[in-house]
Amino acid sequence: MLARCSSASIQGMEALPVTVEVDLAPGLPGLQLVGLPDAAIQESRERVRAALRNSGFRGPLVRVIVNLAPADRRKEGPAFDLPIALALLVASGQLDPQKLEGLCCAGELGLDGSLRPCRGILAIACQAKTQQAKAFVVPSANAAEASLVGGLPIVSAQTLGQLVEQLRHGIEHNSCPHPTREEPATTTSPSSASAPSSAAPLTIQHFARKALAIAAAGGHHLLMVGPPGCGKTMLARQLPKILPPLSDSEALELTRLQSIAGTLGNVTSLVRQRPFRAPHHSTTAAGLLGGGTNPRPGELSLAHGGVLFLDELTEFPRSILDQLRQPLEEGVLWMSRARLRCAFPCRVTLVAATNPCPCGWHGDPSNRCRCSELQRQRYWNRLSGPFLDRLDLQCRLEPVPTGQLRRCFKTTADSTENQTEDSVSPEAVQAARTKMCQRNPSGQLNSQLSALELGRYGQIEERAFQCWEQVVSKRQLSMRSSLRLLRVARTIADLDAVPNVGEQHIAEAICFRSYDQTPKAII
């Protein structure tokens, strides 16, 4: 007898439909899997047998062939345990075939028949809704995640026996409440570094604070260079706090990314907190960008919609940093394999921090630099010119004077006035972004505008254009750097609540281009 059950496999950001076919044929007892299964699916033979036996069902005493269709696409993961077991029960006459009609199933089986959670449930739920499934069958631990997709009935159970009883007796679908859009996420990614609650670092480093506001408002990438202990890391950790809240579409996409990566945890709502990812400089290319035979998202994609912080930038291998160039430009990371090609979104605000030299004290009046000019040159040669070219904002942080250290201990209320003056506040950033959405096509940020769009919608005064041309000619800026200079000037004008870009905005934008092409300015 032949039985079928619908499921799905994860490929990149998408879940593709898979039909699990089970056929019982005369022959020696055994279970054979076909359809390009990976090792985890091959091992499901033993899990399914043990789960059926320990749940009180009869194991087949004939030859069992399980096909995962379409057969030309590789499948991976233990999520096929449940559909294989249900189809096997139908094929052996222990479950009515009509009970599985229109259902999409996914879940891992324990040897005792328990249903265990698996990754990618949110993506599979979206696919099930697209395929107009009657209901989505998942383990109880995944029910809340699956319910994030509205309009899709959810059936869940803790064990295989409980699930079969529900299907046999036609118990109504679980009433998992659809989360409200305003409800915050209950968990965050375990590898995300949460920003500290203190606003102390925003009471010092005025120049860097303005750069932080520009980066938050326009989505510009930021490089901070300074001696140890001047506040680079603490400033970077404040950036997610002044970014506007995630929109519904951004929250759904970020939650889906974390579900596919397996870092979502138990949630009852969409992830609303903007991510802050701070990978160590020993992270591999696969860890930073993503990878694998069936690609998974890396730190770059997991920071989508938030901040990717690269501390000790010059300690990262140059080859890995250069691989970031195209994804940072396009906001999408494409991965090609022999059998597939997929894309992961990676629209991030990159914040990088580094010391000015190997010893870290070059330019510090209180500490003598022990590095030679050759050592400093080699130190900065670890960063390629094209990579530096993509960092819109490049600023030098000076050591905090002793007389200003007490300001670090000010309360949030004490520092509110200074924050407002420097536009380092969520309200100022939100107001600037609102202007961008109203002016720019498709609500793009200034950092995403092309040259044609910037000329058409940027509202740049003629004298500002003349000033910009003089700067480009004098500094011999590349086409990319000159375009980014205009984008930053447009963002500065938005923060100043000025409709047109003037000469003063071009002049201020130039101050944030300290290390164009080469780091000679600090050597």
What residue ranges belong to the model's regions?
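Hydrophobic residues in beta-strands of the RecA-like P-loop NTPase core, especially within AAA+ ATPase
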Residues: 106, 157, 309-316
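Conserved alpha-helical scaffold flanking the Walker A/P-loop in AAA+ ATPase domains
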Residues: 213, 269-275, 285-308, 341
